[in-house]
A protein has these predicted regions:
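Surface-exposed acidic/polar loop and edge beta-strand patches at domain peripheries
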Residues: 1-199
Length: 199
């Protein structure tokens, strides 16, 4: 692990093993802005006009992988993550913690653990409530992928009827979701989604 400058942000952390590498911003976030095979391309989308930005009157996407709190709500969900984050080094990784949001009292944290030997990274997402009252919310991790990628979403093991009569999966459908979109493909053991902005 090393501290580096990346994309206009002066305080970033580079983690790598023999297979993959990732870059975490400390100037904004918590956010992973780069993930790829060693010598390969970043699988995350980046928006060049937003790289290195640390101040704005509005929320910016930046790309990469981030943490929100669900359910989505304006303006709560879109609190700008443009302040420095606390970075704590752990074995084979980092814990990246945002200051509590003044508008919500919620603090976002991502724990990042890179496998020492495999092309694998494990993330733990946490929402920490600093209010004197309970907050009903859920961690919502979002990855903005580069064009041309394919996501494979494994489904739980199948089973015969009538032994297995309870549902094992849920799909959330928004009012604007179009299940006939050709980027969605449904198979017996997985769902495939193709990233193609032209569609």
């Amino acid at each position: 692990m090393e501290k580096i400058s990346y994309g206009g942000w002066k305080n970033c952390y580079h983690l790598s093993n023999d297979h993959i590498e990732l870059i975490v911003t400390a100037d904004v976030g918590p956010r992973i802005i780069y993930l790829g095979l060693i010598g390969g391309e970043n699988i995350f989308m980046q928006f060049p006009d937003q790289m290195g930005v640390t101040t704005s009157d509005e929320w910016l996407n930046f790309g990469g992988h981030r943490l929100w709190h669900a359910p989505e709500s304006q303006p709560r969900t879109y609190y700008p993550d443009m302040e420095p984050v606390l970075v704590q080094e752990i074995d084979h990784g980092l814990v990246v913690t945002q200051k509590p949001e003044p508008t919500t009292g919620v603090q976002k944290q991502i724990q990042i653990a890179l496998s020492p030997n495999e092309p694998e990274v494990k993330l733990i997402h946490r929402l920490i409530n600093h209010n004197l009252w309970g907050v009903e919310a859920a961690p919502w991790s979002i990855s903005v992928m580069s064009p041309g990628g394919i996501a494979i979403l494994p489904l739980p093991p199948r089973g015969p009827h009538p032994e297995f009569i309870l549902p094992t999966s849920r799909i959330s459908i928004w009012p604007y979701t179009n299940l006939s979109d050709p980027r969605f493909k449904f198979f017996e053991k997985y769902i495939q989604i193709t990233q193609d902005a032209a569609m």
